[in-house]
Amino acid sequence: MSKVVSLESLAQEVPSGATIAIGGFQLSRVPIALLHAIVEGEHSDFRAVSAPNPLALEILSAAGCLRSAECGFVGFQYEDGFVIAPAVRHAIATGELDLRQPDVYDTIQSLRAIRDKGKQHADFALLHVQLADSTGNLFIDDPYVDVLLAEASGGVLATTEDLVDRIDKPTIPADRVQQVALAKNGAAPTSCLGHYGRDPLGVRQHIGGTIVRRPDPTPSQTDAIDNFLINLARQVNDNEVIVTGLASAVPMLAIELARRTSAPNLTYINCIGAVNPRIEKAFPTSVEAELRNHCDGTIELPDLFDLARDGGVDTMFFGAGQIDGQGNINLSRIGPESNPEVRLAGPAGSPSMRSYIRRVLIAVPRQLRRNLVGQVDAKTSAPASCNEETVLVTDAAIWHLKANGFEPGSMHEGISVEDLSSRTGFDFRCNFPAVTAPATELELRTLRSIDPAGGRYKLFSERPQPIERLKTTEKVTYEG
């Protein structure tokens, strides 16, 4: 019996109050068409599980139909910069949305435990896939966490780019799938590997953002950015396995610079699962699905966490909304828990990954007293006993975590101890640090060869400003 239905009929299968597990990853293969159809059907009061998929939560929050969500990261990086989902943030502030932000690996392990007990974490898994057949078999080029979401749910409702007669080796077999609808471009404006890329204008319309036109950076600003990237690259060791997480376009570029200069034998695993991806320009985000087509191999997100847990990852880059002198990182909120001034994107997988790796590299492009603080407002991740080395790279110095806290190993040219102290919110010991070695001609030439168009400078720009968002009541049509 055929399981193929219309998109509208598929959406009607999701009743108000349902718990939904949403597939895709960041701005890749999100079931956008299905989400819009659900919203247009005036169903609401949903509970959502996402690992992590902030644009999906943004659509549901903007429509006022999301009651609670489990999502470890509600930000994403794209052509306009880094954005924290604004409707999600607003719904949390007004009390309309109860958001829980566990470590992504905790979510994965919870899904596994529920699956292994034969139970379900969600009523439905909502997916968009590359291929389906009429019996319900699904094929996904880039599964991410989708297989696990399907296995831990009551059933799968899927949209597909194409229907074929038969899929002999399905990613998700028909017995897990309830219904399928044809929806070409059904993941747009997010990407669908093998079919189309991300549409920045469409993303912008969904979140209410616009590109802010800024003057070109001055020579001193471009020099500072190049030096920051070079100093990051110098922390990457040869013959190591190194990983980047979400919103890590800057570290990804630094890793490629290291590969072409001082660390030719490194193994780099991107968070989308691309092993040794070919980096031939400055990408606007580290979550680039197309990298999976230009790499040595792939690994899915649950297996990447397992690899780190089992000691297979040496080094990882981390960001920090705040970091204190003892190495505690805050990615959660600024201000008290009861009334935060700013809600940050969330932990992603940083707590678990930090507890498994030997070398922790922390990138803070602009050192200020408000981000290098005496005490973090929330402890998202902390130093672990397995961390043999923790290095913090800023635009002022290169810091090393010692037994008594961070100490500057070197200060950049033109930075005095007084300058450094004025930009640091914690006390530190300063034992006559060296001056950071200037960039070499080889490093500069190699960086320019990777990114001749200067896309790297856009990675350091401010966030987009709000404009009118795409109205959730607008009819969005999909070919199907």
Which stretches of residues belong to each language-model region?
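Conserved alpha/beta enzyme-core scaffold
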Residues: M1-R423, F428-F432, A437-G480
